[in-house]
A protein has these predicted regions:
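Ligand-binding cleft/hinge of the Venus flytrap
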Residues: 33-40, 53-62, 107, 145-162, ...
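Short Pro/Gly-enriched coil loops immediately N-terminal to beta-strands
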Residues: 79, 100-117, 165
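Alpha-to-beta junction loops
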Residues: 22, 61-63, 79-89, 135-136, ...
Length: 194
């Protein structure tokens, strides 16, 4: 809408005037965004989404400020303009599109690799959605994976809300949950899960 375009124009003017662009991320989703423990401060945030943020800042002639937050807080931060943008493995959804501008790449990408991550040695036990009946599934609130769990799995699935994928993987590998709703891309970092 015309009103949205004015908001974006004002944001661009603000970025150019201050020389700073503020980006929200939830740095717990390697390889997109995560923390390099050998680095400090803003340099400790690394990954593909961080590099994209740096590129955008460079093209705008601005300094990139990274603000970390729980994934479920990102949409509100963008909607309230407390940050200029979010690059945090945000898959497209109609709800998100109503409250923020989304790039075409996110709309075309990331939503196809969603699923339930399970221990690799139990993968053969889970071949249909019904196989998760009565199971405990960890999921981040506000994600498309949450929508997957609540709409496509049996109603008796026990949902365990988590604040980060790292928490979910820890719960899965220690047997506290039967699965974690997540991305197959994320699973590539953990050979013990499928």
């Amino acid at each position: 809408t015309e009103e949205t375009e004015v908001t974006y124009d004002n944001m661009l003017e603000e970025i150019q005037a201050t020389g700073k662009i503020v980006m929200a991320v939830s740095p717990d989703f390697a390889p997109y965004e995560f923390v390099d423990l050998e680095k400090e401060g803003q340099d400790s945030y690394v990954g593909a989404d961080i590099e994209l943020g740096k590129y955008i800042a460079e093209k705008l002639g601005a300094e990139l400020e990274i603000r970390t937050m729980d994934f479920e807080a990102i949409q509100a931060a963008v909607s309230s303009s407390s940050v200029n943008m979010a690059i945090s493995a945000l898959a497209y959804s109609d709800e998100r599109a109503e409250s923020m501008g989304l790039s075409t790449e996110y709309k075309l990408g990331m939503s196809e690799d969603r699923g339930i991550l399970v221990p690799a040695d139990k993968a053969s036990e889970y071949t249909t959605a019904e196989d998760f009946s009565g199971k405990k599934i960890a999921v981040q609130n506000g994600t498309l994976q949450y929508e997957l769990v609540t709409t496509q799995l049996p109603a008796d699935v026990q949902i365990q809300l988590i604040s980060s994928m790292a928490d979910g993987i820890l719960m899965l590998t220690t047997g506290k949950v039967d699965g974690v709703a997540g991305s197959s891309t994320y699973a590539q970092n953990y050979p013990e899960i499928a």
